[in-house]
Amino acid sequence: VGYTEHAENRPTFFANHLFFLMGMQWVTLATNLVEFFIAWEIMLVPTYFLILFWGVPETRTRTAIKFWLYTQAGAVTILIGFGMIAYLVSVQTGTLTLDMQVIQTVVPALTGSLTTLKVIYVLLAAGFLVKMAVFPLHWWLPPVHAEAPTPISVLLSGAMIETGAYAMVRFNTIILSSVAIDLSFWVAMLGVLTMFYGGIMALAQRDIKRLLAYSSVSQMGYVLFAIGVFTVSGVTGGLFHLVSHALSKGLLFMCAGAVIHQTQLRDIGAMGGLSNKMPVTAFAAAVGAMSIAGSPPLAGFASEWLMFLGGFHAYESTGNTPFLVLSVVAISSIILSASYMLRFFTTVFLGPHPEDLEEVHEAPRSMTLSMTVLAVLTLIFGVFPALAVDVIKPLVEIISGILPWR
């Protein structure tokens, strides 16, 4: 609420906000293909209007259209993939069914249609990876995250892009498990490329929200790597990372929004020394930055450790040396994560502050309270990762053909 105190037409803003939340929740609760696709599209509509009417005035129309076109293109490939799945299942069972439970039972047994299933895998992955903003399908994300109102940036980076990863696991990993192992290395490699691309681009940014947006691209690369290795430990870590990233990145966008609200600046080069002026915000930003960088004992460390462990388990299970090389390269990307997070924190909060920021003071309690809650949760899931792992792991272990936790 504090972030929108100066927004025009707040009732309409919050109505769209709730509609957006409903779409994301419906995606996770959908039980058939049509229901899932409707929910997937519902996420798009309120987000478009939130950007169009409450985004940065100079660029919001162009940014909203870019978001619409990219996500609609992804939706088309998903729709084609769903149609092909429905056709294959109807041929196999003799009846048209869109129920995911039935599809999940029938599709893994279609051993005579592996080539077609691989085509479906690629079509669905293309649509879901647009939502995840994986390189090279990420171009919509930096301007949208940077120019959307802070509450929407928090949900876009902390929740909406995660729905793409959730869908990848639900369809590509579970339903299409019979071909997932054949394509796993290429998916993992795309994840590693995304890690490095997003990290390098984040290092080059001066706009505080755009830096965090490219960081989200990099972090989705971690998740895609974990999905790609197709091991219990990797997929468990990837799903856990959705939780840790939602907490950590949501926290960082809240901190960035508070800084922009108090200083009226977005250029981190014009900031500095804000830890003296905004100590609660600085503490919360430190927690979020350390978690994204993979520092113990925070949630980001626990989830990243599991994801990288999954890469080595893939090598142990398959004897495929490229998995070993890819895992080592993936681990080295932590250097980039630490670098851009260190640059973010030191440039904004440490050192002397410019004279024109002399009158800056701490953000309102309506902002600092929400930051504190997310910071505490980030610490709790880091110290007690079993809170998430013990829920996720048993569900991952039943995926057909997945490589075991060794």
Segments from the language model and where they lie:
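Cytoplasmic/organellar membrane-interface segments at the starts of transmembrane helices
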Residues: 148, 275-281, 341-406
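Central hydrophobic cores of alpha-helical transmembrane segments
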Residues: 16-17
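Hydrophobic transmembrane alpha-helices and their helix-loop junctions in integral membrane proteins
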Residues: 1-7, 11, 20-36, 46-347
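Short phosphate-coordinating micro-motif centered on Lys-Gly-acidic
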Residues: 41
